[in-house]
Amino acid sequence: MGTLQNGVSGWYARLDRCLDNREQQIDIWLSTWEKSLRSFQPIAALLPEDWPTLPANLLTDPGHVLDHLLARHDAESDGRSPRGAHPTPPRLADAVICSEMKDNLVNPKKPVQQSNFLMSNLPPGFRQHVEQLNLPKATQDNDVDDNAEREAVEQNKRTLSGIPLPVADTAAGGGLFHARLIRRHADAHQDADPELQKEDTRRLFSNIQLLDVDPLVVKSTKTRLLLESIRHELVSFGPETPGKISREEMEALLDAGVMQGDALQGEWPWTAAPELVLTNPPWLRIKDRFRGMEDGSQLRKELGERLRNLTDNGAPRFSTMRGNVNLYRLFIERSLQILKDGGRLRIIAPDSLLREQSSHPLRELLVKHHGWTHAWAIEEANLLFPGMTQGVVVLGITANGEAPALNLHGPITRSDLRKEGEGLSSRVPVFQLIEDRWTSWSRDTWAVPRLPRDRMERSHTLKVLDRLAELPRLSDEEHPLTTNQRQVRVRVGEIDQTAHAKNI
């Protein structure tokens, strides 16, 4: 259903039949995008004639087409089918970004206007009733200290537009998160002082950190961020102009802020630790890497050994590696190491992380050593990622912080995502998972339950979980099914019957 709604999946397949060189596809797309910006013509009118007709819903966001092409390139480089490649939806990226933004300081807050309506104009009965209500007078919101926030701007800890700095991506892909930040930054500076915008734009691009292992991705990301900035009138094609920095300066800032490297195995190339990491790393097991290569088996074995042997200050870099290691779990642990203390990680991952046994060490790390504050549960992910059957979770974690409870948001649907406020509709149910209750449910595995959206069903589910938590588990010695001091074992959802064959 998601693929039909998307309506564009066939365009990429037709493009592959027309031109099967992915690098050339990306190069032509980016150069045509630049021509479109220079000539103020639609990008579809400038594409080569032998390219398939561009669907209408791809005309408005050229960056999303680049994300698709890079996702297909990434899949093919590992020998996987490009049909299973799913770039991050811009709508989800916008919601995630929104949840971590600070107050906009570009335009000063307007004082709350007091009503000039006189109480004496009300009839006596109404006036007496209003006086009994004892309504408070409207006051200015003082939750945010503007002076402290402006000082943070001067120290390059944030932008006037509300973006925490430095802001990083440990698996940049096409730079989607930073491209959406550019859009948000430009919107915040709309109708603002041009010189203020220019100064804040320099501040932003002097404090971006994007890393990716693929040289084609790095090159494409630099071009994409340049074109996005030109599109949103933050950068000029030539020399510096009012409100816009020059292209030459922007390219120098991008060379310093977008680099090629391996975030998992290498060192973080920037000296300043990021304040915020926004990322959607590869959802790929090590055993699925290098499938299209002759010596893929040996390469996988060597990669696994290298990752297990990596150390920092004598301690393993990845302390939670278990079973069939999935790369997104390593990116979570590595991103938390890179962040400054108190920095925030927002990462998109499969929702199996919340419950699978092999992720138990990682969940324990997040609870015991960091502040795991949020989990957005998106169960109907096929409406966001066309063709995907797996659920998605967006984690919110404070590096080396503490969290009194995990705020579990969901189930979330596509229509719940927002570009303002906290990124989610107020209709989305929120459940605070307190540590004591969490422990009694999961017996220290820190598994997160899947809760229904309906209020009555949710209440019933919580009561059932509380009741089940008091009963012995199948693997407990005191369970009634334990015979001859041998507990029932569960494998992949089925009871192991070998120990009880005589009694069946």
Give residue ranges: language-model regions.
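A general structural motif
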Residues: 162-164, 205, 273-274, 342
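Short, glycine/acidic-rich hinge or "gate" loops at secondary-structure transitions
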Residues: 110-121, 235-248
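Conserved SAM-binding loop
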Residues: 221
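Conserved SAM-binding strand-loop segment of SAM-dependent methyltransferases
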Residues: 256-261
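Class I S-adenosyl-L-methionine
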Residues: 1-203, 211-217, 262, 267, ...
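Signature of N6-adenine DNA methyltransferases within the class I
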Residues: 1, 87-92, 147, 172-175, ...
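A short, structural micro-pattern
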Residues: 202, 252, 388-389
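Short beta-strand element of Class I
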Residues: 208
